């Protein structure tokens, strides 16, 4: 008798299982898309390198373009201050 009750799931339990499964599948799909995008980005950098561009400089520019102007200016000021302190400027 206990197995008959266990075999029949409550609707709320079934809903929770279905919802959990859907969430996991979405995460897996997004992880796969993220991997594909990462591969595509790596290919673009490889193409740029093949065309003679400095990949390290490109990565720096991409990172800097993500920052707002004030944040970027502050970071550049700090870098310049450190470089002056080290006699590099």
UniProtKB/Swiss-Prot annotation:
Coiled coil feature spans: none
Record-linked InterPro entries: GapR-like, GapR-like_DNA-bd
GO MF, any single term: DNA binding
Domain of life: Bacteria
Pfam assignment, any one: GapR_DNA-bd
HAMAP family according to UniProt: UPF0335 (MF_00797)
Similarity remark: Belongs to the UPF0335 family.
Name this protein carries in UniProt: UPF0335 protein Nham_1221
The organism of origin for this protein: Nitrobacter hamburgensis (strain DSM 10229 / NCIMB 13809 / X14)
């Amino acid at each position: 008798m206990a197995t008959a009750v266990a075999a029949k799931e409550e609707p709320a339990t079934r809903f929770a299982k279905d919802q959990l499964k859907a969430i996991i599948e979405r995460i897996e799909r997004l992880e796969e898309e993220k991997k594909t995008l990462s591969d595509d980005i790596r290919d673009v950098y490889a193409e740029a390198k093949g065309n003679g561009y400095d990949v390290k400089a490109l990565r720096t520019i991409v990172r800097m373009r993500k920052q707002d102007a004030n944040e970027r200016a502050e970071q550049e000021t700090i870098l310049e201050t450190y470089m002056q302190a080290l006699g590099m400027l």
